[in-house]
Swiss-Prot record:
Protein name according to UniProt: Small ribosomal subunit protein uS4
InterPro entries the UniProt entry points to: Ribosomal_uS4, Ribosomal_uS4_bac-type, Ribosomal_uS4_N, S4_RNA-bd, S4_RNA-bd_sf
Taxon lineage: Bacteria, Bacillati, Bacillota, Bacilli, Bacillales
Origin superkingdom: Bacteria
Species of provenance: Staphylococcus carnosus (strain TM300)
Gene: rpsD
Listed GO MF terms: rRNA binding; structural constituent of ribosome
Entry annotated with the keyword Ribonucleoprotein: yes
Alphabetic keyword roster: Ribonucleoprotein, Ribosomal protein, RNA-binding, rRNA-binding
Domain S4 RNA-binding: 92-155
């Protein structure tokens, strides 16, 4: 399945979650396109609810179904709660950490920065957005990329970095201190529904 490239605003309203991270999509019309008010959403089947939750998380991270499912399978091989492990693995993606550090305004921008070779891990260029970070690794902007407007503007407006990361604004680098707790990850996602979705297939 291809990565979604359509209107994030319509997709955000349909799923009831801000895919841009700004929340602007839901400010005026916090209901799905085609509805004429917030109370007209039709009742969904159990399967449809599970599918919708899966799509919410997949579109939030902007990854293909294959990448998403492979990460889900990998999470199932770890000890602990499957759904929480899955959420943590997604948060450990390099593009997700670049976004969380505030080096990009959106996850899509973060993915592009990585893919275009502007990001290093432990001093070596890594251009794979799905690269999984380990505690202690350092994510930084390549020296010749540090003056890019997209990065400078993102850092300037960002006012929050999660506690599982340690960011040095002057050096434009951040350390992946530890694996995040579930409480530090998107609260609007019910990952158990996603586990149930794949379990039923």
């Amino acid at each position: 399945m291809a990565r979604f490239r359509g209107s994030n605003w319509k997709k955000s309203r349909r799923l009831g979650i801000s895919l841009s991270g700004t929340g602007k999509e839901l400010e005026k019309r916090p209901y799905a396109p085609g509805q004429h008010g917030p109370n007209q959403r039709k009742k969904l089947s159990e399967y449809a609810i599970q599918l919708r939750e899966k799509q919410k998380l997949r579109y939030l991270y902007g990854i293909t179904e294959r990448q998403f499912h492979n990460t889900f399978i990998e999470a199932g091989k770890q000890s602990g709660v499957h759904g929480e492990n899955f959420m943590r693995l997604l948060a450990r993606r390099l593009d997700a950490v670049v976004y969380a550090l505030g080096l990009a305004r959106t996850r899509r921008q973060a993915r592009q920065l990585v893919g275009h070779g502007h990001i290093e891990v432990d001093g070596k260029r890594v251009n794979i957005p799905s690269y999984t970070l380990k505690p202690g690794q350092v994510v930084s902007v390549r020296e010749k990329s540090q003056k890019l407007d997209i990065i400078q503007e993102s850092v300037e407006i960002n006012n929050f970095v999660p506690e599982y990361l340690d960011f040095d604004e002057e050096k434009l680098s951040g350390t992946f201190v530890r694996v995040p707790e579930r409480s530090e990850l998107p609260a609007e996602i019910n990952e158990q529904l996603i586990v149930e979705y794949y379990s039923g297939k």
